[in-house]
């Protein structure tokens, strides 16, 4: 019916994926809260219902808040740079080209290549690429790719410190100021 060589090849593929699936571990990301989740009263269980949705939305909030902080309190603020259709960062503060991410959860080659290319593009135009991550549970391969691409990567408290050192705004204190005002009801 099927050639033995074919069956062995398919079996080898299936076995390799069985082992990969069996040994797959998931980050604790979905069980850990952060300052934005707390601002809205988003529980870990609610976030687990649709991680991609919450990650995308919380990432946009992070980007908008950081941008507003630098716009109103940063020195030498400028909006995002554009190179053709590409927008390799969210804002400029002096020589720092700042991009914001909630976390980097994708390790696909396209995403990693983009970070490397954008880092080189920004450096070649006289900027220091700075990546401000809200969380500290991003994929290690993604962080490595960013650093290889010339990005200065700050995670969690280091991001908060960077923001404070460049604007005087304590983002944790700022979000606590609005605590319980925007709790979602579900």
Regions flagged by a language model, labelled:
Residues 1-69:
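Interdomain/boundary linker segments immediately adjacent to catalytic/signaling cores
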Residues 57, 61, 65, 86, ...:
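Short, well-structured alpha-helical interface segments that form or flank functional binding sites
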Residues 71-77:
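Short Pro/Gly-enriched beta-strand edge/turn motifs at strand-loop
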Residues 91-102:
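Conserved catalytic cores of phosphodiester-cleaving nucleases, focusing on short active-site segments
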Residues 134-186:
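Domain-level recognition of nuclease-like catalytic cores that cleave nucleotide substrates
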